[in-house]
Design a protein with these regions (language model features):
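Structural/interface elements that position substrates and couple domains in central-metabolism enzymes
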Residues: 1-187
Length: 187
């Protein structure tokens, strides 16, 4: 299964074949690629922290969109790349807060995460923002508020909701999307 389909879809398809040689290899390879893709935002975060000289544990991360997908609307958390990112950041000691257009604060707390009470204030306080689903409300978030602190901030746009050039034009913002990160320093 290509794209961000639920992991169960390719696994159910594979289990429906009785002969091991008849297993749908392509769907299983796609599943592996999807699992690896959910680590990409974390690799960007690590590279960003290294390049700007900020210890990972000192960072405040705002993860926007922990539902599996934003459109059509759902509060389904199964297979959520947003959850993968949030939990991995927490394991690194990063202060993580969550906002989702559909998932309730109670559901966020039940998932072991901290919901934001004021989205605008959370954006201002964040050192990095991870946009992890394509809910239409996510594209109306004012990421330019991130530049209110004196150091460079990271915007990971997992769904291409923002114009890269416009975001990069905001002083102090580093834009990243799957396969791209604003050049900061030579590696």
């Amino acid at each position: 299964m290509g794209g961000y389909c639920l992991p169960k879809d390719s696994l159910l398809l594979a289990s429906s074949f009785s002969q091991p040689n008849a297993m749908p290899r392509l769907s299983m390879v796609a599943r592996t690629i999807n699992e690896q893709a959910s680590r990409f935002p974390l690799e960007i975060f690590e590279r960003f922290c290294s390049q700007v000289g900020h210890p990972e544990k000192s960072m405040n991360a705002l993860v926007i969109g922990i539902a599996f997908k934003g459109e059509p609307e759902t509060n389904d958390l199964r297979g959520s790349s947003g959850l993968v990112v949030a939990y991995a950041l927490q394991e690194k000691g990063v202060k993580v807060t969550i906002w989702d257009a559909v998932v309730t604060n109670e559901e966020i707390v039940a998932a072991g995460l901290k919901p934001v009470l004021d989205l605008d204030e959370a954006v201002i306080q964040a050192d990095c923002v991870f946009l992890m689903n394509n809910h239409r409300k996510n594209s109306s978030i004012d990421v330019t508020k991130l530049n209110r602190k004196s150091h460079t901030k990271l915007v990971f746009d997992g769904w291409g909701l923002f114009d890269r050039e416009e975001t990069e034009a905001v002083k102090g913002l580093c834009y990243s999307s799957p396969g791209y990160m604003t050049p900061l320093l030579e590696s």
